[in-house]
Amino acid sequence: MLGKGGKRKFDEHEDGLEGKIVSPSDGPSRVSYTLQRQTIFNISLMKLYNHRPLTEPSLQKTVLINNMLRRIQEELKQEGSLRPAFTPSSQPSNSLSDSYQEAPPPAPHPCDLGSTTPLEACLTPASLLEDDNDDTFCTLQAVHPAAPTRLSSAALPAEKDSFSSALDEIEELCPTSTSTEAAHTAAPEGPKGTSSESSVQKPEGPEEGRTDDSRFMDSLPGNFEITTSTGFLTDLTLDDILFADIDTSMYDFDPCTSASGTASKMAPVSADDLLKTLAPYSNQPVAPSQPFKMDLTELDHIMEVLVGS
């Protein structure tokens, strides 16, 4: 039992593992140590990046994995044979985002089975992989910018051909509206021959437009007549304008005509007939030739009759 305030002392092997970095001796023990270290490094990366938890991720496990990777990195720095392949500063403090990251694609590790040191050959240095990746990235970046120039040079004539073919199709469908537009667009682009061809096509447009108008007139029904604004005004009469919205079938001022039936109610009533029926109620006789020269008293009387009925 340890007294109060006493410190627990590590054993020799524990002290070496905890406080110091184990310095493996030369020989098979070194090979086994490097293999174990590489295996732990791979497993830690796999758990850190390719971890799909069914429950909530554990912060303690993430911290342990990060500490292990940081320790392996320090060993690699002290050995000086490999460049740091893992930067602890790039790892965010949030463990939730780390656990949901996808694993990077595994790089192929070439292994020489016929060599005398198979374990050493299986462990490919990360520096070589980084150098290879840098070279491939540089070559890809050098190749890709040259591709758009070739594509653009090859696509320009194709676009011109498609534009000209589209113009031809539009001119065939509606030559009257697009003949002038084609002449304006073809003048700055094409030579003088194209402008002369467009000028030749101009007189053909109105003739075809006339034929289209004649066909449209033929397709109209026989009773359809196109009238101008003056003809439309002359065809209408004042009776149609003033008394078009009055239903006179409901107002029968003569009791004898009420028994004539529905035929008499549906008969058209003109303004003169209406004024004749209203004449007995007025003080002065109203002439049929002057229906619109009534006094204000007569208008008031007519409104009273209409409202009362």
From Swiss-Prot:
One of its GO terms (molecular function) is transcription coactivator activity. InterPro entries: E2F-SERTA_domain_protein, SERTA_dom. Disulfide bonds: none annotated. Residues 33-80 form the SERTA domain. Keywords: Cytoplasm, Nucleus, Transcription, Transcription regulation, Ubl conjugation. The keyword Heme does not apply. Residues 89-99, 175-189 have a biased composition (Low complexity). Polyubiquitinated, which promotes proteasomal degradation. Residues 1-30, 79-114, 175-220 are annotated as: Disordered. It holds the Pfam family SERTA. Residues 230-306 are annotated as: Required for transactivation activity. It is found in: Nucleus; Cytoplasm. Residues 8-18, 204-216 have a biased composition (Basic and acidic residues). Disruption phenotype: Resist development of obesity because of enhanced lipolysis and thermogenesis due, in part, to an increase in brown adipocytes number. On high fat diet (HFD), show reduced white adipose tissue (WAT) weight with smaller adipocyte size, improved glucose tolerance and insulin sensitivity with lower fasting glucose and insulin concentrations. Animals on HFD have higher and lower concentrations of adiponectin and leptin, respectively, compared to wild-type. They don't develop liver steatosis and have 57% less adipose tissue macrophage infiltration. Acts at E2F-responsive promoters as coregulator to integrate signals provided by PHD- and/or bromodomain-containing transcription factors. May act as coactivator as well as corepressor of E2F1-TFDP1 and E2F4-TFDP1 complexes on E2F consensus binding sites, which would activate or inhibit E2F-target genes expression. Modulates fat storage by down-regulating the expression of key genes involved in adipocyte lipolysis, thermogenesis and oxidative metabolism. GO terms for cellular component: cytosol; nucleoplasm; nucleus. This is SERTA domain-containing protein 2. Interacts with XPO1; which mediates nuclear export. Interacts with TFDP1; modulates transactivation activity of TFDP1/E2F complexes. A motif (Nuclear export signal (NES)) lies at residues 233-238.
